[in-house]
């Protein structure tokens, strides 16, 4: 007989991923809204801090339960390089995307009146406020440059995540890992974040983008730059994380759980 405790145990890991991504988006998109929609001068650093705090809080709430992936690209990389069960990948990714949807919905509900004022009315919704939740590239960026920017930043992210979980390479304790991720995201945003708003995470972009579609932002969300939403913030991070994992395990990792074994 299945008990409530059994069902709770069955969904505990996906729910940790759900709340982790929801917190990531609440802090990150919330910071973007507060900076852009206020009368204060825009500050990319403030937005950068918001996303960095979000990744740290998301990792803290989920790390000891689900591993704190809070990113489909990292989940797939962990399945490829660290033996994470492939059968759990779909439930993790679904939970991560839904967390992005709910996180964006909560931020939108909190700032809806400010968005109305900024846009000039309740039924006016443009890319100017969509970009507070989903990622868009700067106008001068080519398609190849957009892809490479997301690929490169996610490769660095994946390499560092594998380093932070490598007990043979001075990995921090569980309590310090979120702080290390905070520092990592500050660095990634400061160095590689300007041109594409550094999604690095399919759930962080696709979840909020799905919510925006439900909120009335229209087809432009998905028609922008020939389906930018698919190849830049989804495909590029997934491939970038695979590349980062390949580099780390080929040249640095000495464990037995990698498919790349030198012994």
Swiss-Prot record:
The keyword Membrane applies. A motif (NPA 1) lies at residues 71-73. The chain crosses the membrane at residues 18-38, 45-65, 89-109, 144-164, 175-195, 228-248. It comes from the Eukaryota. The keyword rRNA-binding does not apply. GO terms for cellular component: plasma membrane. CDD domains: MIP. Pfam families: MIP (PF00230). It is a multi-pass membrane protein. One of its GO terms (molecular function) is glycerol channel activity. Residues 39-44, 110-143, 196-227 are extracellular. It is found in: Membrane. It catalyses: H2O(in) = H2O(out). A motif (NPA 2) lies at residues 201-203. Residues 1-17, 66-88, 165-174, 249-263 are cytoplasmic. Its main location: membrane. Keywords: Membrane, Repeat, Transmembrane, Transmembrane helix, Transport. Probable water channel required to facilitate the transport of water across membranes. Aquaporins contain two tandem repeats each containing three membrane-spanning domains and a pore-forming loop with the signature motif Asn-Pro-Ala (NPA). Belongs to the MIP/aquaporin (TC 1.A.8) family. This is Aquaporin Lacbi1:233199.
């Amino acid at each position: 007989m299945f008990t409530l405790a059994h069902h709770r145990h069955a969904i505990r890991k996906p729910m940790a991923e759900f709340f982790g991504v929801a917190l990531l988006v609440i802090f990150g998109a919330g910071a973007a809204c507060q900076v852009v929609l206020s009368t204060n001068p825009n500050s990319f650093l403030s937005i950068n801090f918001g996303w960095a705090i979000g990744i740290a809080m998301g990792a803290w709430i989920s790390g000891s339960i689900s591993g704190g992936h809070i990113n489909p690209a990292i989940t797939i990389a962990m399945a490829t390089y660290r033996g994470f069960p492939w059968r759990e990948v779909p439930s993790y990714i679904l939970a991560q995307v839904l967390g992005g949807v709910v996180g964006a919905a909560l931020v939108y509900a909190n700032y809806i009146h400010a968005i109305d004022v900024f846009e000039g009315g309740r039924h006016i919704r443009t890319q100017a406020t969509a970009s507070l939740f989903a990622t868009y590239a700067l106008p001068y960026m080519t398609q190849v440059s957009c892809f490479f920017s997301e690929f490169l930043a996610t490769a660095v992210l994946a390499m560092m995540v594998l380093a932070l979980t490598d007990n043979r390479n001075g990995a921090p304790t569980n309590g310090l890992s979120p702080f290390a991720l905070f520092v990592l995201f500050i660095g990634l945003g400061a160095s590689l974040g300007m041109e594409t708003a550094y999604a690095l995470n399919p759930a962080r972009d696709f979840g909020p983008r799905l919510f925006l579609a439900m909120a009335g932002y229209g087809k432009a969300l998905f028609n922008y730059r020939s389906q930018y939403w698919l190849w830049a913030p989804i495909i590029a991070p997934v491939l970038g994380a695979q590349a980062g994992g390949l580099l780390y395990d080929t040249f640095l990792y000495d464990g037995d759980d990698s498919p790349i074994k030198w012994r």
